[in-house]
Amino acid sequence: MDLDNNKYYQQALQYIADTDLSELENGKHLLDGDNLFVNIVDSDMKTPEQARLEVHDKYIDIQVPLSKDESFGVKPRKDCVEPDGEFNTEKDILFYKDKDWTTVTVEVGQAITFDPDTAHAPLIGEGTIHKAIFKVKVA
């Protein structure tokens, strides 16, 4: 996927660079309507056994941990073999039961991007995390 030519992705990166995300209130913040928005959330973290891989068709995720480091399970979508239900077009999400992923840890101050070709299992860790989840329309 050519992210360099996705104007919404470039807008998101600029917003991340220019904004203190920790100052944003929890909730959905529209940056360019449904083309680009960010959800600021507090979420309970999960064990690797509890975490589920997810994929999206319409949106690229940029996930930014704000309060603590966060680990993610990551696997190419084409290699996922065990869907957990049907694709939910309204929520733009499909889960997988696969557990044979690579674990990546993202530190506070870093961001990670997941395009529609990459399955990801977020929120791996202990306690509660404050984070930003950018939803970037696939151009």
Language model: regions and residue ranges:
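Short connector loops at helix/strand junctions that flank enzyme active sites
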Residues: 33-35, 55-59, 65-67, 88, ...
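A short, N-terminal "cap"/entry segment at the start of jelly-roll beta-barrel domains
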Residues: 1-40, 47-55
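Conserved metal-binding segment of the jelly-roll/cupin
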Residues: 104-119
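Short, conserved beta-strand element in jelly-roll/cupin
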Residues: 58-70, 76, 85-93, 135-137
